Design a protein with these regions (language model features):
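Short alpha-helical DNA-recognition segment
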Residues: 15-34
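A short, Lys/Arg-rich alpha-helix, primarily the initiator
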Residues: 1-13
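Short, charged recognition helix plus adjacent turn
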Residues: 61-92
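The alpha-helix within a helix-turn-helix
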Residues: 11, 22, 52
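Short, basic-rich loop-to-helix N-cap that marks the start of a DNA-contacting helix
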Residues: 39-53
Length: 92
């Protein structure tokens, strides 16, 4: 499921109107409508996290639906890649 459809489904399950949801996020309803209809890419990380919080869902699930790693995991993955490359090349 794409991010917009995922969030719309969760929002509707909670009985939250789209205009009210956008207002809670501090963005225009028109912009959020475009996100839910997949006319816009998923929003910035802070909006994904805030949307998950409002909906009471795991933020990691929302990031996965947005085809992104959560910010803390990005750093960890980067560190692992650097460590692997150092070990593979014998770099100290």
């Amino acid at each position: 499921m794409a991010f917009g459809a995922f969030i719309r489904t969760k929002r509707e399950e909670k009985g939250i109107q789209m205009n009210d949801f956008a207002r809670q996020l501090g963005i225009s309803p028109a912009y959020w409508s475009r996100i839910e209809r997949e006319m816009e890419n998923p929003p910035k990380d802070e909006l994904i996290r805030k949307a998950a919080e409002i909906l009471g869902i795991n933020a990691d699930d929302a990031f996965v639906e947005a085809s992104r790693l959560p910010p803390d995991m990005r750093e960890n993955v980067g560190n692992l890649v650097r460590m692997y490359r150092k070990q593979a090349t014998g770099e100290k």
